[in-house]
Every structure is written in structure tokens, then in C-alpha cells.
Amino acid sequence: MLEIFYPGWCRKAISFTIDDGNIEMDKKFISIVKPNGICGTFNLCSFNFDKYTPDFYREMYEGFGIANHCKMHPFLLKGEVGEVADEPFNANTADESKLYKTSKEGVYHFHAPNGWRRKATLKAYCELITECHAELEAVFGEGSVASFVWPFGDQGSADILEYIKDRHGYGAARKTGNMEDSTGFAVPTDRMHWSYNASHKNLLDCAAKYEAYEDDGELKFFAFGVHSVDYENAHCWDELSEFATKYGNRPSEFYYAPVDDIFRYYDATKALKIEENKIINPTNIEIFVKIDGKPTTLPPRSTI
């Protein structure tokens, strides 16, 4: 009998997905999760090289995953552009009914219900994704960025999803919204529309459900988000600390990894082949299994 596990022979993974690259808040977040062995992904959209060096970013985010969160953090402009003001943008004097040009062609300042934001034409949006990809990989290394996270949630564009797959080979795009336990904590298979299970609002409650979730023989997935500054604004760093202390440093029960690593591992388990009395691992990933109750591993590109 073949049983599939995560590394460490556990069946539950824990990760996080944190947006925007707020340096001070990300530092505080990391200071809580990292000592407890909890890993995840930071979704970045820009660098402040006037203040921080590439080495600073590499050191700060070392050991974590990095995803593309789109340069300039725009909405997608849908329909006609609308009226564009001639004068330069000034948030204090701008007409809220008009658009204002930014430094990037096809990207405009506009007034949303919660203040001034940016939106981009489809062409400009795709260009910003590519610019962000190049800048991230220049800092973190070629091949370090393999997925996309929508600014402001899923913008409903099949064209953009096709673009990130064809241009950059991305295998996942994260939207916004707490899934909680609605999927039975299954590893997302619709990777172009996946979302996290919990945020600062329900982290401890959802984690308790996850811990109690019965082992049904399948690999499970729990990710929480969504901005480090959320924990500051809601005054709930204590809840994050409680979560990290309670659910961290338990490698025999939880697998801690960046989101993309969990997805790749899961996909590798689904690629296993059983032929007669042989188990074939055609992937480049070591897979943890039990055969007739005995723990073992399937080395990359191996047959046992």
C-alpha cells in the first residue's frame, strides 16, 4: 500500500501569502514567524533603492518565496479611458471626476472610494507585470519568481492570465478572499484563481479547524494573509504570535514552505506512476511516502 506525505511524513502544510512589501511591517512579521519555522511567500511590486540596497532585500527575504504583485499596484482599466486632465497630478487639488497621467504611459491616477489609486490599460498592465518580473529576478535571481498575485483582487481578465502563462511561465495567480475551510483544506488545483484560507480576522479560528481536520489520506493546505500592516492596523500582532507559537516548530505535523514549493510538491506526487510492482517518480523532486506502513522516500527520477 502506497501512502503519500509531505516532507517529514506529515499531511498538512502551512504557508502564508503577504502582499505589498511594507518593509517595516514585513520585518515585524518575519520576526514573529521565522523563529517558529513558519515559511511562506512575500508578494512584491516595487523596490525603494533610494533607501535600501538589493543586498538588503535579499537578506531580509532570504528563505522565503517571492511572487510578482505588479509594479505600481494598479487596477485594470476596463472600457474607455475617460476624461484625462491636462494638468499634472496633485492629490490635494485634483478633480476627482478626472483621470491624471502618471510617469508610465497607459497608467492613470483615479479617485476610488478610499482615495487616489492607479489603473492601467491592458497593454500597460502587462508591461508592468513584465517590468516587475525583471526587477524581482534581478534582485532574487533568475527563476525565483514563478507566480502572480493580483493587486486589489482578481481583475477578471483572461488576457492577463494568458499573458503571465505565455510570457513568464507562471503557474498560479492568487486572488483575494478568505476561503476558510470551504474546500476541505484541499491543495488548490485551479491555480489561476486560488486564494488563502485565513487573514488576520480569522487566523486562530481557522487554524484550529485545520489542526482538528481529520486525516483523509490526502495532502492538505493552509495559507494565511494578506498584508503585514493588517496586523498593525488591527492591533493583533499578539494573535499572530499566538498562532506562530502554537503551530510553528512542529515539523512532524506540519510542512512549512513557500506557496509555490507546496504546489510543486503536490504536483510531483500526482505524477507518480505505479506499474506492476514498480513505483516510478519521473519528477525532479524527492517524495516522502510510506510503503506498507514503512516510511521511505522516492528519489528524483527513480524507480523502486
Predicted features along the sequence, with ranges:
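Catalytic-core region of carbohydrate-active enzymes that cleave or remodel glycosidic bonds
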Residues: 131, 135-139, 159-177, 197-219, ...
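Active-site metal-binding loops of divalent metal-dependent hydrolases
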Residues: 18-21, 70, 228, 259
